[in-house]
Regions:
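Conserved nucleotide-binding/hydrolysis micro-motifs of P-loop NTPases
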Residues: 7, 61-64, 109-110
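Short, well-ordered beta-strand core segments
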Residues: 40, 55-57, 102-104
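Short loop/helix-cap segments at secondary-structure boundaries that form the rim of catalytic
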Residues: 47-53, 97
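ATP-dependent small-molecule kinase phosphotransfer cores
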Residues: 1-49
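NTP-dependent small-molecule kinase module
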Residues: 96-139
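Short hydrophobic/aromatic-enriched beta-strand-loop microsegments
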Residues: 1-3, 56-62
Length: 139
């Protein structure tokens, strides 16, 4: 489930002038996607606030992230916000506070295929690993 699409389809949050969604986390939690008999993967930058069995946080070196966001024509303020968030472990910290099992993966030097394989392996083994990626040198 792509969480951004799910929120738009289910009218969770308010669309801002810049096209981004402003989302009330409690509203999202009350309306989160439900798994049927099979497991589902929920992908999105707010997914770590949901009630999950397992949470994987993908990490990227802040300088690499800045290059990628520049290539996607993100605004300077949005790039800065994302880079600072990554460097300060914001999503990881929130995931650790909200989830029982967290696994982080540094994707900086990995291909999408390598990341996919690592995610599958982590899910199958229910591994837990957090706090192994450190970007404090960025500042």
């Amino acid at each position: 489930v792509r969480l951004n699409e799910y929120m738009r389809e289910n009218r969770i949050g308010t669309e801002m002038e810049n096209g981004e969604l402003e989302v009330d986390i409690e509203e999202l939690k009350q309306n989160q996607p439900e798994a049927s008999e099979e497991e589902i993967i929920i992908e999105g930058h707010l997914s770590h606030f949901l009630d999950l069995d397992y949470c994987i946080v993908l990490r990227t070196d802040p300088e690499t992230l800045e290059e990628r966001l520049n290539d996607r024509d993100y605004s300077e303020s949005k790039i800065q916000e994302n880079v600072e968030s990554e460097a300060l472990d914001v999503v990881l910290s929130q995931a650790v506070q909200n989830q029982n099992k967290v696994f982080e993966i540094d994707t900086t030097e990995k291909s999408p295929e390598e990341v996919k394989e690592r995610i599958i392996e982590a899910i199958e083994n229910r591994e837990e690993r957090k706090g192994t990626v450190d970007w404090t040198g960025y500042f």
